[in-house]
Amino acid sequence: MRIKDGFILRKIAGSDMVVPVGQNIADFNGIITLNGTAAFLWKILKEGSRPSIMAELLMKYYDVNNEIATKDTEEFVNQLKEANILEYDEDEV
C-alpha cells in the first residue's frame, strides 16, 4: 500500500501537515495534522510499504515494543483508509 498521488506532507508553522494538491483539493476537504510518529509512518508509506514492515521500522527508530508499534501503525493506517488516502497493489486487495 502507498499514499495516493495528490497528497503531500508539508511543515507549516512547525507542524507536519498533509495537504491535498491538484484534483484532491476539491475532493478532500481540509488538511491533516500529523504528530512525529505519524509523519515518520507517512514518509514510509509514500514509498509504499506493509503494516508489518512499518511497525518494525517504528520499533527500531523509536525504540518501542512490538505491541505499541503495531497498535500505532494499525491506527494510522485505519485513519488513512477512512480518509481514502491509500492505494493498494493488486496482491493487497
Where in the sequence are the language-model features?
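Long, charge-rich, low-complexity alpha-helical segments
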Residues: 30-93
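Acidic, low-complexity/disordered tracts enriched in E/D and polar residues
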Residues: 1-46, 89
